[in-house]
Amino acid sequence: MEAFLGSRSGLWAGGPAPGQFYRIPSTPDSFMDPASALYRGPITRTQNPMVTGTSVLGVKFEGGVVIAADMLGSYGSLARFRNISRIMRVNNSTMLGASGDYADFQYLKQVLGQMVIDEELLGDGHSYSPRAIHSWLTRAMYSRRSKMNPLWNTMVIGGYADGESFLGYVDMLGVAYEAPSLATGYGAYLAQPLLREVLEKQPVLSQTEARDLVERCMRVLYYRDARSYNRFQIATVTEKGVEIEGPLSTETNWDIAHMISGFE
């Protein structure tokens, strides 16, 4: 018996105490061991977004901007969260819609919200313009990208200030531009051609026409994008302020579904 206990103590000499974890000794080899405290590799947790949102659409009209995004949060290919908002009101003249990682969008919402509060506390009568918010986001996204720890989002910023409509785009690399119509995600391939087709024929839309166009594109995306959902929000900004409507849905028709084959 004593020999048996002696062999056990020899086997576990230098090992972990009950309930503790084994710590690898600090040797030159441990520099390459991920379990070692000496190992310092790149941050990779942001390279795999968990809950994501798909397309955001934006269109300018005479006197404002309209933005739309569905309310689905996808966990991979699973339609996990079906009632999340991907559009935020930044201030009375600016709104923002985001696709990509929802956790990163929540972080940006918190940061932007605090920025707006800090600005209002000054009490000088000034607030961030849509163009200022767009410019700040380009710097923030590029900064995080340069640190190899990007915010995994593509954003559409819409606003109305000084009698001018503003619609801007920022992606996770800090790439930014302005356009009369914008679409992110799968919408860049399916919805943007539809938006441009209408705007090429009629460059200036009314608010009703812009809203109808966006609703039509949301219906097409629901038909064609497997990560979209028939519940969405539409946000409108005019000189009166920002208004977010929803959840909304569109009427769909699946009568021809039985004719589609080869994609099962």
Curated annotation (Swiss-Prot):
Key words of the record: Acetylation, Cytoplasm, Disease variant, Host-virus interaction, Nucleus, Phosphoprotein, Proteasome
PROSITE patterns per record: PROTEASOME_BETA_1 (PS00854), PROTEASOME_BETA_2 (PS51476)
Propeptide: 1-45
Alphabetized CDD domains for the sequence: proteasome_beta_type_4
Compartment(s) of residence: Cytoplasm; Nucleus
GO molecular function: lipopolysaccharide binding
Matches recorded under InterPro entries: Ntn_hydrolases_N (IPR029055), Proteasome_beta4 (IPR016295), Proteasome_bsu_CS (IPR016050), Proteasome_sua/b (IPR001353), Proteasome_suB-type (IPR023333)
Induction, as annotated: Up-regulated in fibrolamellar carcinomas.
Modification sites for Phosphotyrosine: Y102
Statement: the UniProt record of this protein carries the keyword Phosphoprotein: yes
Keyword Cytoplasm: yes
N-acetylmethionine: residues bearing it: M1
One Gene Ontology term from the biological process aspect of the record: proteasome-mediated ubiquitin-dependent protein catabolic process
Source taxon at top rank: Eukaryota
One term under GO cellular component: nucleoplasm
Major site of localization recorded for this protein: cytoplasm
SUPFAM superfamilies: N-terminal nucleophile aminohydrolases (Ntn hydrolases)
Positions carrying Phosphoserine: S26
Function: Non-catalytic component of the 20S core proteasome complex involved in the proteolytic degradation of most intracellular proteins. This complex plays numerous essential roles within the cell by associating with different regulatory particles. Associated with two 19S regulatory particles, forms the 26S proteasome and thus participates in the ATP-dependent degradation of ubiquitinated proteins.
Protein name listed in UniProt: Proteasome subunit beta type-4
Organism: Homo sapiens
